[in-house]
């Protein structure tokens, strides 16, 4: 159970970082 929690937490963190970096790139391309 704890292993599953760690995996799900890692996936959530990965998605947050991915979306954050993606939005940052989009902002930079649009000309901040």
From Swiss-Prot:
Pfam families: PetN. This is Cytochrome b6-f complex subunit 8. The chain crosses the membrane at residues 6-26. It comes from Illicium oligandrum. GO terms for cellular component: chloroplast thylakoid membrane; cytochrome b6f complex. GO terms for biological process: cytochrome complex assembly; photosynthesis. Belongs to the PetN family. Keywords: Chloroplast, Electron transport, Membrane, Photosynthesis, Plastid, Thylakoid, Transmembrane, Transmembrane helix, Transport.
